[in-house]
């Protein structure tokens, strides 16, 4: 293939540049770019840059300036000092020619940027760059840098600069500090950028003074003023970086603060001035002096500011108006501590805080119209945090605190008004992003109100209770009522019994009857907000059972609303679970209510699941097992009907399929009905779980008799098992059915006894029906893990048989993936977790160690070691946990056969484990895995006397994954690990060694 010929003349290069800026095929443009880049980077690039800048075309000139930039970035280190000075003069010379010939700003700005690039590479030899560039522009020629010694004062030079050259200096100066400010800290120190830039601060202040302060009375070019303000902003932000990096304060800049602020009333300069001071207040308020803040206070009190503020509050959300609001908020953020502490004595603070409260009440809906509300809420969150900090850090309540509380209460009242939903037709007309943002803003208000309770206490609760009662009196103020209820629900974590008198007013009001109306005038949002209140105060209903019937009647009436059924059923379940004991006398009514729901088929399936779980929790609270039997039978009859309906539908669907008959429209699929039945069983199982705070009866008999497993209650278990078995057989390839059946069993596996605490062999039968091909078999393995935990709690010999059979089943899954964890990580992880749970109880060790055939046991151990060296994080984590437990097994097992088996296993597997751990720590593991992998290493060192020799052999093995560490470093690592004897510091040593093996710059030997 012939080598592509590069252009040999300047005209050819110019032609290529012109082609580049014309629309053309992407391939052609890419090829031109590639050719031009080769030319730019070639040794002739310097000459090319000069040639292109001599063109009459703006595009070609721009490309010439770009070529200088590229050459500086690629070849600056090869330039001698004299050559570098020549390049500087050439670039300045071209800038002067461009300005004199009236070039457009694109080329002038590019040349200014190129000069900044030059400074970044040669800052030491061009320290007073602004003074030198200004002198050259005034002279109209590029003179050597050392000639600035002959230059007049900067004030004289600045006064003699025409506007176009002033703009060039401003562009260069702003870009200079912006680019230096982007430099990382190491480069900043290495190149001493701060040291050199600081030498220019008085020079730039002189230039800026000309553009910002009108000392002559002659009108200043608007463009020069705007660019002066932008440049001033860049230098102020850079001064913040200089202060943070090196405690450098650029005091001369502060002389411009007040003159710059005065420009805010100039319409042409308003936008840049507001942006500048909002930026300073938000990011570097310490730049401003006390006098500057006084001037800002005066500004916000002026008629100009009052007019701006009034426009914003009246619903003008144009960019400039919102900018003013942001400016006011930035001032509030910067002075928030003073505002809070001076509120009771300083009229200026009162005025500012009053204005900040007002920002929360601007006309218009949040987000859709009102663009200042969300940042205003953020300010009040900062205000609250500040007041809390100031008031909690003193011994006595400060005198300003009541006034600070009062203004916060005013802010919250404004928030309450604004958080009310628009009319439904209005809200639905917004786009999805606006609706989501509106709801986010409401959550922000909720957070503010919740946190405010820490400062305002019960008076805040009382205020929302009063608002609720007023809305109830009005009868149809649904938006107000919804907002008030939503706010009241926020206090659930902060108020307890002391709030009962306020909640009495709410729950004793006509609110229940209002919201239980059968007509459609009550918005679903208002009902849902009341649900949130009920959910938030379950302990209240335990103390005030007289309100329980009203609450439950309301909830049951809401079950028929498609939009509220799911959340309502969950609320019913939560309330019944919390108040289960007091609801026992109402159990018959609940069963009757559920019977009607089932008969009418009037609610969604998920609503049935919630309600049936609620009833089960009431059954759990009955005084003895015998009393639970009949109501449980009634509950299971409902489930049985759904199950039988599913089987009937399934047979009908088979018949239709055989005869090519279409399934009738609207008919529910058989599997959906079956899933509803199984999920109802899950809800029943969860409802029957004994609450965690129930006292343990220490006098319970330790015999193995169980009413549910051995007595009259066994019929309940048999019925459930029959339903689950039939479902499993009817839908053998249905992963969701398999998963939900697993969940049913797991609800009982956490219980010591109960209707759903099945004998282990019953659960095992379900597990053994599954194999590697079973959809969602992972959930079945997890059930096996739960079952092994349950078996570990008793000494029953039958449990040992079940555990042994489960181990055989799990080993079969490992065999199905060819004993390679990477073939199916999702299967591997829970399988290894099963092994870990099996050995977590010493009495089960013999089950693992006596597993037959021995080849299968060896495969099991090797499977975990392969997972340990694999790339899949979850199996690796489980394997690390397994080995951390296995190597630290007690050495005094009373069963000598088991003890000998442990010893033999570790003698054979210890070196392999050490090799796997060292392989990971030698760089093969991910950094996030190191802490977990350090656990078996620490246990190995503590518990195994041969650990050092095993680890040393692994470090010296040919399979060690890194060549970045030598033998000496490996031995240092081993010595540190052994000396730590399993202490937590091992993790740090492992991390350091891993870094060294990865080839980082970390100096390991220290």
Regions found by a protein language model. Give the residues of each.
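Karyopherin-beta/Importin-beta family HEAT-repeat alpha-solenoid scaffold
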Residues: 2-1006
């Amino acid at each position: 293939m012939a080598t592509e010929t590069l252009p040999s003349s300047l005209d050819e290069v110019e032609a290529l540049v012109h082609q580049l800026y014309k629309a053309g095929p992407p391939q052609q443009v890419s090829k031109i770019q590639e050719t031009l880049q080769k030319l730019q980077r070639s040794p002739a690039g310097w000459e090319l840059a000069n040639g292109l800048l001599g063109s009459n075309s703006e595009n070609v000139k721009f490309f010439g300036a770009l070529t200088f930039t590229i050459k500086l970035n690629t070849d600056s280190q090869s330039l001698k000092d004299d050559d570098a000075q020549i390049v500087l003069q050439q670039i300045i010379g071209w800038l002067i020619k461009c300005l004199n010939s009236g070039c457009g700003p694109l080329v002038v700005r590019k040349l200014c940027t190129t000069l900044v690039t030059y400074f970044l590479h040669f800052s030491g030899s061009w320290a007073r760059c602004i003074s030198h560039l200004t002198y050259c522009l005034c002279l109209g020629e590029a003179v050597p840098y050392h000639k600035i010694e002959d230059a007049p004062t900067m004030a004289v030079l600045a006064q003699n600069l025409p506007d176009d050259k002033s703009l060039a200096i401003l562009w260069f100066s702003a870009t200079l500090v912006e680019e230096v400010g982007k430099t990382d800290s190491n480069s900043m120190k290495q190149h001493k950028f701060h040291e050199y830039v600081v030498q220019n601060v008085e020079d730039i202040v002189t230039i800026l003074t000309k553009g910002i302060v009108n000392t002559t009375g002659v009108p200043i070019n608007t463009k020069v003023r705007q660019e002066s303000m932008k440049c001033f902003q860049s230098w102020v932000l850079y001064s913040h970086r200089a202060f943070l990096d090196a405690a450098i304060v650029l005091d001369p800049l502060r002389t411009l603060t007040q003159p710059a602020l005065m420009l805010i009333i100039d319409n042409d300069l308003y936008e840049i001035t507001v942006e500048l001071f909002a930026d300073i207040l938000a990011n570097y308020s310490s730049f401003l002096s006390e006098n500057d803040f006084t001037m800002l206070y005066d500004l916000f009190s002026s008629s100009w500011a009052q007019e701006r503020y009034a426009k914003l509050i009246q619903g003008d959300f144009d960019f400039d108006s919102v900018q003013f609001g942001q400016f006011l908020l930035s001032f509030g953020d910067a002075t928030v501590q003073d505002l809070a502490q001076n509120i009771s004595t300083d009229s200026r603070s009162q005025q500012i805080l009053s204005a900040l409260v007002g920002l929360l009440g601007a006309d218009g809906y949040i987000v859709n119209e009102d663009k200042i509300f969300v940042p205003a809420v953020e300010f009040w969150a900062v205000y609250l945090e500040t007041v809390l900090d100031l008031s909690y850090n003193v011994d006595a309540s400060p005198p300003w605190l009541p006034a600070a509380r009062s203004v916060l209460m005013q802010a919250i009242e404004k928030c309450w008004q604004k958080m009310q939903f628009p009319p439904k037709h209005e809200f639905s007309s917004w786009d999805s992003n606006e609706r989501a943002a509106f709801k986010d803003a409401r959550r922000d208000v909720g957070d503010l109100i919740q946190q405010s309770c820490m400062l305002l206490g019960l008076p805040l609760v009382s205020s929302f209770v009063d608002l609720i009662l007023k809305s109830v009196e009005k009868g149809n103020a649904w938006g107000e009522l919804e907002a008030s209820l939503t706010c009241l629900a926020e206090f659930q974590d902060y108020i307890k019994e002391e709030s009962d008198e306020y909640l009495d007013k709410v729950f004793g009001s006509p609110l229940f009857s209002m919201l239980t109306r059968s007509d459609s005038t009550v918005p679903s949002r208002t009902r849902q907000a009341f649900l949130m209140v009920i959910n938030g105060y379950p302990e209240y209903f335990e103390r005030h059972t007289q309100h329980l019937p009203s609450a439950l009647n309301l909830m049951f009436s809401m079950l028929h609303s498609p939009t509220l059924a799911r959340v309502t059923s969950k609320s019913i379940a939560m309330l019944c679970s919390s108040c289960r004991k007091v609801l026992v006398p109402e159990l018959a009514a609940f069963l009757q209510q559920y019977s009607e729901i089932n008969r009418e088929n009037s609610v969604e399936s998920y609503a049935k699941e919630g309600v049936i779980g609620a009833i089960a929790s009431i059954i759990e609270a009955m005084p003895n097992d015998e009393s639970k039997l009949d109501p449980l039978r009634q509950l299971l009859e409902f489930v049985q009907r759904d199950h039988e309906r599913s089987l009937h539908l399934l047979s009908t669907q088979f018949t239709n399929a055989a005869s090519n008959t279409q399934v009738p429209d609207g008919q529910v699929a058989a599997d959906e009905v079956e899933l509803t039945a199984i999920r109802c069983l899950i809800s029943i199982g969860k409802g029957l779980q004994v609450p965690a705070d129930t006292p343990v009866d220490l006098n319970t008999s330790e015999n193995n008799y169980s009413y549910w497993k051995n007595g009259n209650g066994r019929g309940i278990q048999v019925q459930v098992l029959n339903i689950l078995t039939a479902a499993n057989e009817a839908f053998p390839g249905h992963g969701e059915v398999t998963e939900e059946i697993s969940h049913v069993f797991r609800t009982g596996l956490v219980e010591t006894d109960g209707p759903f605490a099945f004998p282990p062999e019953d659960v095992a039968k379900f597990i053994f029906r599954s194999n590697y091909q079973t959809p969602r078999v992972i959930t079945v393995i997890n059930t096996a893990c739960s079952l092994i935990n349950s078996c570990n709690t008793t000494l029953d010999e039958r449990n040992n048989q079940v555990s042994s059979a489960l181990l055989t089943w799990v080993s079969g899954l490992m065999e199905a993936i060819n004993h390679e964890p990477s073939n199916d990580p999702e299967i591997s992880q829970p399988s290894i977790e099963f092994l870990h749970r099996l050995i977590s109880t010493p009495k089960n060790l013999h089950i693992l160690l006596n597993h037959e055939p021995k080849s299968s046991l060896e495969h099991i151990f090797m499977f975990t070691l392969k997972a340990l060296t694999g790339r899949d994080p979850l199996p690796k984590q489980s394997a690390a946990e397994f080995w951390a437990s296995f190597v630290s097994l007690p050495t005094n097992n009373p069963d000598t056969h088991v003890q000998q088996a442990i010893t033999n296993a570790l003698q054979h597997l210890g070196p392999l484990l050490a090799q796997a751990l060292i392989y990971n720590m030698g760089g093969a593991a991910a950094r996030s895995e190191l802490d977990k992998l350090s656990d078996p290493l620490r246990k190995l060192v503590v518990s195994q006397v041969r650990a050092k020799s095993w680890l040393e052999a692994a470090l010296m093995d040919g399979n060690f994954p890194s060549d970045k560490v030598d033998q000496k470093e490996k031995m240092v690592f081993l010595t540190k690990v052994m000396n730590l004897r399993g202490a937590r510091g091992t993790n740090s040593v492992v991390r350091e060694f891993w870094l060294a093996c990865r080839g980082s710059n970390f100096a390991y030997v220290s």
